[in-house]
C-alpha cells in the first residue's frame, strides 16, 4: 500500500486525484492539503509519495520540502524552466534515494502524441504546434506544447534538416506564434475547452495532423497512478512520463 499525499487537493485536478486515491485498492490517502495548510502533515502522516497539482509560484518550495524529508514527488504543476530542473537536481544530490517526476502532461494520449510527433518530424519540411486550453490556464504556451516542440526540434536536428521554410516578412505581433527552437507554437484560450493539442506537419503534396483531446480531468488519472506506483523505483529527476510507459 502506497501512502499518497495530494497538494492542491481542492483544485480541479486535485479533487479528481483525491477521489482516485480513496477508491484505488493499492493506494491510501495520507493527506489532502491545499493553500495555507502545513506541509509537516505529510511527514506526520508518513507519506510515501506526494502528488502536486498546485501553482507555479509554490511548487518549488513544495518539492524542496519533499526532497529534504525523503518523500517522492509526482508533479503535474506547470511553469518549469531549465533553471528549476537544475535546482531540483542539486537538491537531489543530498537525497539520492528520492524520486521526482515532473510531467508536462499525464494524459497517456498526450504522451503518445509527443512521441508520435518526434517520430514523424524527420520526414516533413514544416511542423507547427497548436494547443487549446480553458481560459483559466495561467501559462502560455502550455508545458505540453513546449515539450512537443522541443522533441520535434531535436528530431529535426538529429536528421540534419534545414530550418523550416517561412518567407513571412511582415506580421502582427504573435501572428506566427512563439518560436520554440525553430518550431512555431500557438496557444488558444477558449471557454468550453479542457486540454487539446494539434501537431501539423507538411511536406511536398501532403500533410499530417496528430491531435489529442482531453475532455475531462479524469484523463490525467491513469498517468498519475503510473507515476505514483513507479516513482520509488526511479530515484533522481525524471522529466516526462515516457520512461514510465516504456517509450524511452
UniProtKB/Swiss-Prot annotation:
Binding-site positions, (S)-2,3,4,5-tetrahydrodipicolinate: 134, 143-144
InterPro entries assigned to the protein according to its UniProt record, in alphabetical order: DapB_C, DapB_N, DapB_N_CS, DHDPR_bac, NAD(P)-bd_dom_sf
Keyword Amino-acid biosynthesis assigned: yes
Main location: cytoplasm
Keywords annotated in UniProt: Amino-acid biosynthesis, Cytoplasm, Diaminopimelate biosynthesis, Lysine biosynthesis, NAD, NADP, Oxidoreductase
Official protein name in the record: 4-hydroxy-tetrahydrodipicolinate reductase
Organism: Corynebacterium urealyticum (strain ATCC 43042 / DSM 7109)
Active site: 133, 137
Gene (UniProt): dapB
GO biological process: diaminopimelate biosynthetic process; lysine biosynthetic process via diaminopimelate
EC number: 1.17.1.8
Protein's pathway: Amino-acid biosynthesis; L-lysine biosynthesis via DAP pathway; (S)-tetrahydrodipicolinate from L-aspartate: step 4/4
Any one GO molecular-function label of the UniProt entry: oxidoreductase activity, acting on CH or CH2 groups, NAD or NADP as acceptor
Annotated binding of NAD(+), by residue: 8-13, 34, 76-78, 103-106
Sequence similarity: Belongs to the DapB family.
Keyword hit for Transmembrane helix: no
Compartments (UniProt record): Cytoplasm
Amino acid at each position: 500500500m502506497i501512502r499518497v499525499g495530494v497538494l492542491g487537493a481542492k483544485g480541479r485536478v486535485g479533487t479528481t486525484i483525491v477521489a482516485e486515491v480513496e477508491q484505488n485498492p493499492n493506494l491510501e490517502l495520507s493527506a489532502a492539503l491545499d493553500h495555507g495548510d502545513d506541509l509537516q502533515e505529510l511527514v506526520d502522516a508518513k507519506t510515501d509519495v506526494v502528488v502536486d497539482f498546485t501553482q507555479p509560484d509554490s511548487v518549488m518550495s513544495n518539492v524542496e520540502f519533499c526532497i529534504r524529508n525523503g518523500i517522492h514527488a509526482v508533479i503535474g504543476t506547470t511553469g518549469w524552466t531549465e533553471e528549476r530542473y537544475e535546482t531540483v537536481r542539486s537538491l537531489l544530490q543530498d537525497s539520492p534515494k528520492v524520486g521526482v517526476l515532473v510531467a508536462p502532461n499525464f494524459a497517456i494520449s498526450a504522451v503518445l502524441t509527443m512521441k508520435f510527433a518526434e517520430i514523424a518530424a524527420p520526414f516533413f519540411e514544416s511542423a507547427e504546434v497548436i494547443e487549446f486550453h480553458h481560459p483559466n490556464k495561467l501559462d502560455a504556451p502550455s508545458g505540453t506544447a513546449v515539450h512537443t516542440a522541443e522533441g520535434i526540434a531535436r528530431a529535426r536536428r538529429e536528421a540534419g534538416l534545414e530550418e523550416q521554410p517561412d518567407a513571412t516578412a511582415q506580421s502582427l505581433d504573435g501572428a506566427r506564434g512563439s518560436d520554440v527552437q525553430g518550431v512555431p507554437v500557438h496557444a488558444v484560450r477558449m471557454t468550453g475547452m479542457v486540454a487539446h493539442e494539434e501537431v501539423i506537419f507538411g511536406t511536398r503534396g501532403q500533410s499530417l495532423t496528430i491531435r489529442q483531446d482531453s475532455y475531462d480531468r479524469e484523463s490525467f488519472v491513469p498517468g498519475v497512478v503510473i507515476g505514483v506506483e513507479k516513482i520509488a523505483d526511479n530515484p533522481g529527476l525524471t522529466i516526462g512520463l515516457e520512461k514510465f510507459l516504456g517509450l524511452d
